[in-house]
Amino acid sequence: MLPLAVILSELQEPKTIVPVLSSLRSGSPVWSNISGPDQKHLVSRTLNLTRSSIQFRRWFGINVIRVLADNYKIMAGDGSQIIGQLLKLLEQCNQFTSAVYFKSLVECIDHVCDSIRGKPTMTRELLTPNLPAIIGLYLEKFSHDPAYLVSRLAPYIRAHPTTFRPFGNKLRSKIMETILSPAFSNFPDSSKDIFCNTLSTLCAVEKIEPEERWSSDLFSLIGELSNTLEIYGEFLNFEDDAELGKLLKKIPRSSSGESEFPSLSIDINDPSSFYSLPERLDILLRLIRGYLSAPTSFVAKVPLGIIALVVEAVLSINSRFIPFKREIRDESTKQIIRNTLQCAHSSALGLLKVLPSIFRGSLVPYMRRILGLLETLIPMKKKSLDTDQIVANEQFICLVLDCVACNISLVSYYQDSTGLVRLIDAAMAIVQPRSSSNTSSNTANTISSNGKKKKKQASVPLADVLSHQHLFNISVSESTTNHVQSFVNTLISCADLPSAQHNKVCKFVIVEAVKASHHIQEGTVPKQLRNLLVNAVLHPGFETTSILPIVCSILKEDELLSVFRNPRFPPVLKAVEVKEEEEEEEEEEESEEEPEEAEEAEEVVNGSRTEREVAPETKEVEPENKRRKIEIPEAVSVEPQVSEPQISTSLQHSISNQPEPAEPKNLRAPEPVKQANNPKLTEPSAAKDLREDFSDDSDFEMPEIDVDSDDE
């Protein structure tokens, strides 16, 4: 970073601009401790550069002002002086001013306005008073660089429509004058689009109902287009195509008011006059596209159905289906008319190409009919493709393929793939290797000759053609290959192609993959080709073969393809026996229940369960066989009043389940348990006798069992 003293000295005698601009940028340490006098000194030195008579110094000062405009303090203190000096420089520009200097000055003025716009106080004090002068100077210098100044005026129309209102008609007349000039056809497409888009934004300066002005302008353009299409009726028999007549009647006519477009003059004896017709159609279609694509600050209703009718009407005028009139007999005149029709079709395709990106799913109802019209644009020779015409009109075919891809991409699956057969064949035809016509004709003449050589020297170049014919092939341009790749990429992911066409597509993909193998050494594969290869693997169609090995050899580090090459399944779960888990759970439950049962057993032994036990009425000793029967669970369930047998049964169960039970210190219950289990009942009648004994209505009472007694 340069210190402030060095910057001031450099502004006095400028030599290199980059270090100065980098040191003055926003956030630089220079601004952290700059004083007020130093700031005034910096601004005055910069303004002195802009007042120099040397153009380089003025250009140097303009670029420094552009950097200083990011500083709020400088613009708040000296903004009015800076803007005034810039407007003086713009006023001094003339036809001898260099384009670099002029563009730098205009960009600096726009940057200063952008830095002020949005700040209420600065906008009120600096920008609003100077806006009329800025717009007026832009219109005054309009002839210096029309396309550039129109692009710079568009933001002022959107941001300041009220201030721009007095200049709206003047700008509109200048734009229309440029559009209707003969030189407009030589402008690049980007410049043409700028003029058309800016003209559509002028509707925002209307004081009342700008949306109505927008709609009326659009319908007037559509009516003018309909009138222009009827001129082709002077050369072609529209009466032979009833559908075309219906289409033209559905398109609204222009109003009876005076049109902004002058009438066309076409002389049948002057072939060059025919090209004014497609030029007028191109202007109208570009203007319609500008009205549809340019952003507006108001809500506008778009007649999408009429727009679709306009495109359909232009594409339906085709000399393949509509014959020429008898008056048109000259073959050269017919060929010129065919060429003008193709130019008109190209303009309509330009409008059709942008519609999917604007209206999306609203175009789906018109998609099938549009694709049918696009298929008719492919040159045919009887029932087969005219490959020579397809190759000769390579750019037009690429535009058709782009429109097809844009419309098919609106849906996730397109069912009617039979209508795409011609389009696929045409796409494959323009990417095939070609040989020049001169070499092919020379080769044919050589083969048809009788072997007589007039001169030995004449056969030298022909020998190269015969032995190394591949060196004379014309390579397909990269742009054409990209168009076809994009078209194929959309088709294989949205439609199931017929077997023959799918094989052609796969062959094309494999050839492109092999051609791209040299990119492996460079480490990069084009993104579009990468997507095409991946989609070709993901959508194999009805074929049993796969190009996965070839694609994997090229895209080795692709994560998606690595899943197909080395499938990674989820980790295998270990099988666990449920029985073991249940046994462990039972053991845990038993271990938790053992202390409780031990406490219950201790209470039973010590006679502490007085609350749960039912005291018997008598203390008679029960016979031995009766005591054994009480331990059976079935007998216990019969008498709900007796709870003592249930307690003894649970105690027995808890003790018998343990292999080596740990006896409590004062627990002496195991002895009566062993005595009760000593005799075994093997007869089934024992259980029956037990039930009969319990069901007997005798006066037998349950004696109290004294577990504390010592049998020994």
Swiss-Prot record:
Disulfide bonds: none annotated. It holds the Pfam family RIX1. Keywords: Nucleus, Ribosome biogenesis, rRNA processing. The keyword rRNA-binding does not apply. Residues 435-456, 575-712 are annotated as: Disordered. Residues 643-659 have a biased composition (Polar residues). It is found in: Nucleus. Residues 579-603, 694-712 have a biased composition (Acidic residues). Component of the RIX1 complex required for processing of ITS2 sequences from 35S pre-rRNA and the nucleoplasmic transit of the pre-60S ribosomal subunits. Regulates pre-60S association of the critical remodeling factor MDN1. Component of the RIX1 complex, composed of IPI1, RIX1/IPI2 and IPI3 in a 1:2:2 stoichiometry. The complex interacts (via RIX1) with MDN1 (via its hexameric AAA ATPase ring) and the pre-60S ribosome particles. This is Pre-rRNA-processing protein RIX1. It comes from Meyerozyma guilliermondii (strain ATCC 6260 / CBS 566 / DSM 6381 / JCM 1539 / NBRC 10279 / NRRL Y-324). The gene is RIX1.
